[in-house]
Each structure stands twice: as structure tokens, then as C-alpha cells.
Amino acid sequence: MYRGRFAPTPSGPLHLGSLVAAVGSYLDAKAHRGEWLVRIEDVDKPRAVPGAADTILTQLEAHGLEWDGSVLYQSQRDSVYQHQLNQLENAQRLYQCDCSRRAIRARSDHYDGYCRNRQPRSTPYALRFINNNPVDTFNDRAHGLLEDHSASVSEDFVLKRRDGLYAYQLAVVVDDIEQGITDIVRGSDLITPSFWQLTLWQYFTGKQPRMMHLPLIMNDDGLKLSKQNHAPSIESSQARNNLFTALDYLGIKPESELRHSPVSEILQQALQSWCKKWHIAGR
């Protein structure tokens, strides 16, 4: 059974770019008669803004994006991530690294495995995954075959940070596997970390989820629309207009008379268009 998810970081309310990812992942799940889960990716606790998670959920509801099951919060799952690290340590797939970013940059444009065969001389330290079998190619439903044979893809990447926080790469894969995610639909800015994540998927399960990376929305300066670049939040009171704009970026144009219809009707027509666009049968 198809199971997808939308996994925002609660560093602020949803903006148009994150709405595009939410709508795309929602439509794809419903087109496949699957489930659409919501996960709050607050593993990076200092980035989480108080109240932002609740605001995001309210915004999703206002736009007719109803999720299946209960919402998962990464900030409540430290013991799960630590257990997985313990398993990796027992399998001798981790090592300690006390290299600073400055030290790494001074040696190379990627992490060179400097600490793999030595004990760190000081604390704190990060934990790196011994990346013996990197995944450097995968098929993307929107982009076709994607390849990255650069040294950064095959480097030993961090699973627990020097500040003691669990790395996003670990948390997202552990959660996806535990939740039974079969399909990941998200923005194209996450293509690069996909290679590390698929490496972990392959190590943990021997298989990979289907991937689909959606187009990004750029601002007037040519930068990705994001909270970091001060993208304005969407207004729930403008849900119909927001959906029309998001769907336009996804290559879907609902009939203009639907601008005054309930959001459920807009999404229903968008669902039919999504099936046609991506050649999904059965709707």
C-alpha cells in the first residue's frame, strides 16, 4: 500500500513553497489511494519556534489537507534514534569525529575520513556513519535517473552532531522506515541529501522508497522561497487563492469558477488533473 508523508520543520508557519510540497505529496498519495501522514521534523530543537507546529497543522486543515493517523514529532523520539545508533555502533559502523567545519574545509571540499582510524583528541565529538556502500544513483519520478558521483556523496556523514543533537539524516530515515513510508514527494532542494538517506535506507532495509522531487519556487532574487530567506507565511483566510497558486506551480490549472468553491472541490479536481499529468490509473 502507498504511504506518503509531509514533514515540515516548525521553524515558522507554512509559506507558499512548503504549501506546494504539501499539496504535491497529498495529491500523489490520494491518487494512489494511499495514506498521507504528517510528521513534524523538530529534531533540530534550537530551530523549532514555539507554537509553529500547531500553526502549521491549522494551516493544513484550512487548505483541506487532512492527514491520516496521528502526527509524529521527532523531538519526542530521542530514545528511538539513540537505539538505532547503538545498533550501528555494535555493528562497528560508527566512529567519533571531533573535526570542526573549519578544519574540514582547510583539508578538502568534503569530509576526508580523517577521524575514521583515530580516536578524537578532544570532546565534544560527532558520530559519523562508515559509508562503505554509497548510493550514488536513483530514479526520480519527476527527474528520471539522478546521479552524483562526487566525493561528498561517498563521505562518512554525521548521524549525531557535536552539539549532541541527532542528525536530520538519521531521524528522517528511521522515521520513514518505522512509519512504513513507500513514497517520498518533496522539494528539489532535497535531492542532494537523498543520496545519503538512500544509503541508510539500503543499509537498514535493503530497499529504497520511490522518490519524487517537485519544482522549487524562487523569489525575485533567484533564491529558493524559504523561511531562511524570509518568505511570507500563507494566510489561511486565502486558502482558495493559495491552492490555485500552489497548483499552478505544480503544473495544474483548476477551472476558474472553482475559486469560489470549497477547498475540498478544488482538491478533488486537482486530484483528477494530477492523475492525468503523472499517468496514474485507477481514479
From Swiss-Prot:
**Record motif 'HIGH' region, residues:** 8-18
Span of the annotated motif 'KMSKS' region: 224-228
Task: Look up keyword Calcium and say if it applies.
Answer: no
Q: Would you tell me the Gene Ontology cellular component terms?
A: cytosol
Q: Where does L-glutamate bind?
A: R5, F6, A7, P8, T9, E41, Y168, R186
Cofactor binding summary note: Binds 1 zinc ion per subunit.
Which keywords does UniProt give here? Answer: Aminoacyl-tRNA synthetase, ATP-binding, Ligase, Metal-binding, Nucleotide-binding, Zinc
Which protein family is named in the record? Belongs to the class-I aminoacyl-tRNA synthetase family. GluQ subfamily.
Q: What is this protein called?
A: Glutamyl-Q tRNA(Asp) synthetase
- Organism encoding this protein: Idiomarina loihiensis (strain ATCC BAA-735 / DSM 15497 / L2-TR)
Biological classification of the source = Bacteria, Pseudomonadati, Pseudomonadota, Gammaproteobacteria, Alteromonadales
The gene coding this protein: gluQ
